[in-house]
């Protein structure tokens, strides 16, 4: 997979490929992450990427020419990519979209700034994505969020078993996790986790995931198709509830 982020602040974005899982994926050649400075595709000595908007109004608008110059150069070199514009008007990013994008071979992400991008650029954009209903100063952080979430789902980046056990992949929030010490400030690790009984541990984890999801994200639970472990966990939770009555 190749991901190219187009921005006027390349130094801000470069760090994403220098740390952790993504850095290892880049080093191993599983993914290629490039950061392009949009100003390199300007032609004036001031490297101008914005201008006043027609019709008047507050704020500057990003000019179309640099985006088209980049795009045409890119297509000539690599072929047509899947182009994403980070935008508060886009569809809200989630795990399902991350899975969808992880199957793409070549992604370009345009980072918006100022009051927006000249509408004509939309003729080369395939998708608009937002990371939430709030306004940021630019599209760099959303581009990094999208890249991080997508890359870790690319086969070989993270162990498949780890991905399959994550929140959202199973349609449930994660169960509580603990590490040493066994007791801290009077709070103990649940004994079932020290039992060595893998079936009991798995059942406990699923019960806790269901409880947490029902409390915090009932929408996820309502959309989930229950498997056998889910049903066993719900029966066990009901029994525990009845015993307390």
UniProtKB/Swiss-Prot annotation:
Keywords on record: Cytoplasm, Methyltransferase, S-adenosyl-L-methionine, Transferase, tRNA processing
UniProt cross-references to SUPFAM superfamilies, sorted A to Z: alpha/beta knot
InterPro entries found in the cross-reference section: Alpha/beta_knot_MTases, tRNA_m1G_MeTrfase_C_sf, tRNA_m1G_MeTrfase_TrmD, tRNA_m1G_MTases_N, tRNA_MeTrfase_TRMD/TRM10
Gene3D superfamilies xrefs: 3.40.1280.10, tRNA(m1g37)methyltransferase, domain 2
PANTHER family given in the database record: TRNA (GUANINE-N(1)-)-METHYLTRANSFERASE
Family of this protein: Belongs to the RNA methyltransferase TrmD family.
Protein name: tRNA (guanine-N(1)-)-methyltransferase
